[in-house]
């Protein structure tokens, strides 16, 4: 198999096995993104880097889906992190929806690398590269938005739960129509399959709690940073 086939084959095999070196490398990159996002979030070049990386990743991935007429059960953007990629990248300005998906994208990226569930293709297939670089770009774009434009008044806990349950209800319907496993609502990892309705409730509750926790951690960090700034000026 030549390099072109490795990149773009439609023949599913099995997902790559991630070893210790991979985990060390990925989490080093994640730490670097957290640090640089905090330090360079106001730099246009830094913002553009992650925006361009995300755009290229999405164009290549969905171009590959389209050219190869991949089934709707796999090729629609209804995975949580992919929805976040589109919203954080394309939605302009400050809004509760962009903020919600930036919080989701921050947690989702960490979860995706702690417990990776990539597509069944060999490395460096476009789907595997998209999984890696797409999530890294999502984290960068999400952190830049949250560190620059976060507004705690936009999203309270109740709204987070309502938005998550509403979003997953949409994904639930898409899965019924396409036979897919978007949002891992059909076969949730870790907890296993407990039936469609129970899966929906479990995933929605867990995701709502995770986004809420991410929100609280961010607010605590921003509060501490504000106190440091006040102390410096005093």
Regions found by a protein language model. Name each.
Residues 54-64, 105-118, 164-175:
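Aromatic-anchored segments of alpha-helical transmembrane domains
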Residues 23-29, 77-87, 114, 129-140:
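Membrane-embedded alpha-helical segments of multi-pass membrane proteins
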Residues 31-39, 88, 137-157:
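Alpha-helical transmembrane segments in multipass membrane proteins, preferentially the mid-helix core
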Residues 91-101:
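Membrane-helix interface "capping/anchor" motifs
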Residues 10-26, 156-166, 176-215:
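Membrane-interface transmembrane-helix boundary segments in multi-pass integral membrane proteins
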Residues 65-75, 94-96, 117-129:
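Membrane-interface helix caps and helix-loop-helix hairpins in membrane proteins
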Residues 1-46, 197:
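N-terminal topogenic module of multi-pass integral membrane proteins
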Residues 43-92:
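A glycine-rich, hydrophobic loop/mini-helix early in the fold
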């Amino acid at each position: 198999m030549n390099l072109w086939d490795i990149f773009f084959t439609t023949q599913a095999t099995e997902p790559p096995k991630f070893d210790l070196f991979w985990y060390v490398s990925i989490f080093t990159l994640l730490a670097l993104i957290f640090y640089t996002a905090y330090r360079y979030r106001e730099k246009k070049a830094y913002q553009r880097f992650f925006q361009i990386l995300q755009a290229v990743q999405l164009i290549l991935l969905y171009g590959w889906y389209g050219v190869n007429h991949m089934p709707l059960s796999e090729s629609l953007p209804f995975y949580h992190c992919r929805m976040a990629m589109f919203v954080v990248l394309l939605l302009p300005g400050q809004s509760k929806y962009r903020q919600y998906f930036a919080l989701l994208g921050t947690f989702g990226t960490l979860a995706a690398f702690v417990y990776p569930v990539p597509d069944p293709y060999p490395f460096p297939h476009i789907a595997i590269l998209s999984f890696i670089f797409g999530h890294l770009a999502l984290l960068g774009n999400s952190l830049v938005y949250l560190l620059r434009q976060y507004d705690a008044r936009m999203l309270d806990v109740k709204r987070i739960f309502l938005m998550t349950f509403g979003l997953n209800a949409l994904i639930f319907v898409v899965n019924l129509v396409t036979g897919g496993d978007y949002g891992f609502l059909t076969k949730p990892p870790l907890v296993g399959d407990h039936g469609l309705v129970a899966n929906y409730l479990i995933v929605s509750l867990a995701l709502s709690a995770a986004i809420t926790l991410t929100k609280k951690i961010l607010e605590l960090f921003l509060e501490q940073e504000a106190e440091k700034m006040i102390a410096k000026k005093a």
